[in-house]
Amino acid sequence: MLRIRRRFALVICSGCLLVFLSLYIILNFAAPAATQIKPNYENIENKLHELENGLQEHGEEMRNLRARLAETSNRDDPIRPPLKVARSPRPGQCQDVVQDVPNVDVQMLELYDRMSFKDIDGGVWKQGWNIKYDPLKYNAHHKLKVFVVPHSHNDPGWIQTFEEYYQHDTKHILSNALRHLHDNPEMKFIWAEISYFARFYHDLGENKKLQMKSIVKNGQLEFVTGGWVMPDEANSHWRNVLLQLTEGQTWLKQFMNVTPTASWAIDPFGHSPTMPYILQKSGFKNMLIQRTHYSVKKELAQQRQLEFLWRQIWDNKGDTALFTHMMPFYSYDIPHTCGPDPKVCCQFDFKRMGSFGLSCPWKVPPRTISDQNVAARSDLLVDQWKKKAELYRTNVLLIPLGDDFRFKQNTEWDVQRVNYERLFEHINSQAHFNVQAQFGTLQEYFDAVHQAERAGQAEFPTLSGDFFTYADRSDNYWSGYYTSRPYHKRMDRVLMHYVRAAEMLSAWHSWDGMARIEERLEQARRELSLFQHHDGITGTAKTHVVVDYEQRMQEALKACQMVMQQSVYRLLTKPSIYSPDFSFSYFTLDDSRWPGSGVEDSRTTIILGEDILPSKHVVMHNTLPHWREQLVDFYVSSPFVSVTDLANNPVEAQVSPVWSWHHDTLTKTIHPQGSTTKYRIIFKARVPPMGLATYVLTISDSKPEHTSYASNLLLRKNPTSLPLGQYPEDVKFGDPREISLRVGNGPTLAFSEQGLLKSIQLTQDSPHVPVHFKFLKYGVRSHGDRSGAYLFLPNGPASPVELGQPVVLVTKGKLESSVSVGLPSVVHQTIMRGGAPEIRNLVDIGSLDNTEIVMRLETHIDSGDIFYTDLNGLQFIKRRRLDKLPLQANYYPIPSGMFIEDANTRLTLLTGQPLGGSSLASGELEIMQDRRLASDDERGLGQGVLDNKPVLHIYRLVLEKVNNCVRPSELHPAGYLTSAAHKASQSLLDPLDKFIFAENEWIGAQGQFGGDHPSAREDLDVSVMRRLTKSSAKTQRVGYVLHRTNLMQCGTPEEHTQKLDVCHLLPNVARCERTTLTFLQNLEHLDGMVAPEVCPMETAAYVSSHSS
């Protein structure tokens, strides 16, 4: 009986093994193994026979198999087996974004630590290696599926302006695309830039529009990303990235009835995780990127990790992951997309056959595909495809077919299509290739990849971090464009706030004639969106193109100002009095942050006189969803002015002189000059959440009771008189010396003889913390590669700017004090108002060619090689200074701030404009101010950067003790601002808007709007409030984007007594829904029409519908 049981057990075990081995054979025909082992199928029957005679042989076979696997794993194979893949948990409640360190397969900061960054010649793939593949990897049941994707990259401004490109190139490309796609049903084409497509479509006749909709509907023409532009990812703010995406996708939905879910970013110079964050929350499923460091491409390719699930650095659950495809080679042009050998791939760019004026740099031209050569040409091309496929995990391969402004001529369409169709026909018909090739779209490729994933071919790794700073070869790091053309970068941030304010102010009401408001808002959104282009805000376009961007943004600023002042008058004038006049300017906007040139005389001066105009109404607007108290200033014609609210309650004010700085050619110094006709009045305004507050300025015949006057001290040798008109305090003079200043209960700041900050004392009983400001300059190399608009290639460490003994102006008042100094190329001002000091640099690099000016802060903070910079104003990421990389590689984009810290102290520099910066030594921060370069850096621009304009940079400096704060683990890749730093950043990017009433008397004026609005928690912001429907619609829809940042908790947590419910900000709500960030897809109908609370580091969108 025992023998029978043994025999029965043997039969059962043998049967199971037979089943498992059969399944193994079937699956092996369907999917390749991750390793390069070749199974010996001829021995399978012998093995089964042996198993039937006894299981004792099984153990020996398993030992042999393990030995073979060990041998394979020890081979010198550049492609290593994939790592274990972290699985994403289901979304749940709010994540702990501080204490829980996210677990991912690839963390970019850790990867940078491990990588050697050795630039080894890889052969035909210079930055890679000699790829080999198993010729038996594919079979009839497991073919290589190749999608050849025709595309044309159209820059909305670079060498030519938007309109020049459109007239010369883009309209011809799109016109021919319509014709050839309509006539050739198998042909496909993808398009990214909706700014161009919208321009083209609106010029079409009705029949052509119907044809266009037809080829979109049948999938021949596919829109990728669908943004207004393909945005820069380094300097852009996340709100502007979302703005241009919404603008483009809204147009596509309205006119084409499509919403892309696959993104295509082939040309931005480095990639930010902010992009997948916004895309994923806008309904995207997949994205593609190209420009990443060549060493990163090689490292990920070796691991077959070029396709991954890109997570946010705080995400420990996978809620934010977006599937991402990274292109493996040098460029997105045809020579670098079919495979690793550009000499071979160039032969399959049939526009380079000679008649088009293009050729292959490798001296082997393409040939027309014929019956005589199709076999040999197919062998050559399939070999490249299969080598490229080795870098990815599935049997699906993407082959982009295009370049800048391609497919312009009819003949180009024909020559590419006909030759590839001949290749496809031959390749697909030859069984030995085991390849199925066709024209396709990006979405078709991703669909096939995920189908292979579901079939069990592959699991994809998780990755977190960013892809800055980009290098395309050797030590050519693209960190110069973080600063190039800073005047226009500054303009971008000013316009960003104006668009937000104009949309918010106009969303509260709908009134007759609203169409004119809507037109101006659309104009402003589209011009700001256009500037997000990766040759716009980057400062990497030709001079006349930069001028065009500037003019467009100036018009956008005017459009916003028109909307804002009309809306303020509507909101603060009693309904019984209000009568709209859209051609009239009810208010003048006053902004000391702009113009970017810092020319103070361009600001409006309020003319007051007892007989002419004894008083003037001024209004402040707060775009933030909580009460704000902030100092504001105006220019007035008399120093004897008092301030009251509309109920005639006095407000404490301070008057100071208005100073301008001038070059003295004789003494070669920069010195101040006081105005004799205008003065600054400063007072603290209190403004409701997302609301308005009115104040009144009134002239007096003498010093008003509640107005104080600042004293002024000029520290210089050989003083001269400085008349200040009616100002009641004379200027005092003194020899250069160190000084200290404090306002109210704020910190005490100590300054050197040269007017530069030396130290900060946080409280009167605490020690001074050294914080030394310095100005330095970088030079350029005398030979070889040189710095230009894109590249930062310094000739060594920065050298000090010779300051000499500059003139220092000290202004001291109850509400505001300041120290100003005229330095070579910079008028540097430190302003104290009782909190974090404000730094203003009026930078004029003049004619200092091949010079890059930097501001450096030196402290005793023991920060080591760690510092933090922000990404697109959305998040802060940990950086590590790497000595194995050159100086320029350790420079990063600083869109809104950076900080260093040790166990006790943190120093944060917040910036009101995007620039480049770093921490090149422990305890240091530095940020570039401007760069003037005579040479082209050989990246296609064809010029240097010599069109510099004076620019006003504004910063806030926050020094604080953090020893009692809850901080992330040392292993966490994210950093978070404190409450004080967050508020300082908001004051830079979204200050109070200031309006001066244009008329002498305001009949029906109301003192406030928004006093009944709920005040949100300090970490929550209503980043977007926009009317989505035309004013004529019966049901009005308003969209909101809420963002909640995570603030580092220090001390007692803030109590939140009020909850912000955007669904009920406007009356008569009929419906409220949670949507994608672009407002185009409803995700959830909110029962009870109450918006749920937003989690830390989350962004959510809602649309409320209201009856008119």
From Swiss-Prot:
Induction remark: Inhibited by swainsonine and by copper sulfate.
Spans traversing the lipid bilayer: 10-30
Region of interest (Disordered), residue spans: 70-92
Topological domains, Lumenal: 31-1108
Pathway participation: Protein modification; protein glycosylation
NADP among keywords: no
Range of residues in the leader sequence: none
Cofactor note: Binds 1 zinc ion per subunit.
SMART domains: Alpha-mann_mid
Predominant cellular place of this UniProt entry's protein: Golgi
Active site per the UniProt annotation: 267 (nucleophile)
Enzyme Commission (EC) number: 3.2.1.114
GO cellular component: endoplasmic reticulum; Golgi membrane; Golgi stack
Origin: domain of life: Eukaryota
Cofactors demanded by this protein: Zn(2+)
GO biological process entries: encapsulation of foreign target; mannose metabolic process; N-glycan processing; protein glycosylation; rhodopsin biosynthetic process
Catalytic activity: N(4)-{beta-D-GlcNAc-(1->2)-alpha-D-Man-(1->3)-[alpha-D-Man-(1->3)-[alpha-D-Man-(1->6)]-alpha-D-Man-(1->6)]-beta-D-Man-(1->4)-beta-D-GlcNAc-(1->4)-beta-D-GlcNAc}-L-asparaginyl-[protein] + 2 H2O = 2 alpha-D-mannopyranose + an N(4)-{beta-D-GlcNAc-(1->2)-alpha-D-Man-(1->3)-[alpha-D-Man-(1->6)]-beta-D-Man-(1->4)-beta-D-GlcNAc-(1->4)-beta-D-GlcNAc}-L-asparaginyl-[protein]
Membrane topology qualifier: Single-pass type II membrane protein
All ranges on the Cytoplasmic side of the membrane: 1-9
UniProt xrefs under SUPFAM superfamilies: Families 57/38 glycoside transferase middle domain (SSF88688), Galactose mutarotase-like (SSF74650), Glycoside hydrolase/deacetylase (SSF88713)
Annotated binding of Zn(2+), by residue: 153, 155, 267, 534
Described purpose of this protein according to its UniProt entry: Catalyzes the first committed step in the biosynthesis of complex N-glycans. It controls conversion of high mannose to complex N-glycans; the final hydrolytic step in the N-glycan maturation pathway.
Protein name (database record): Alpha-mannosidase 2
Organism whose genome encodes this protein: Drosophila melanogaster
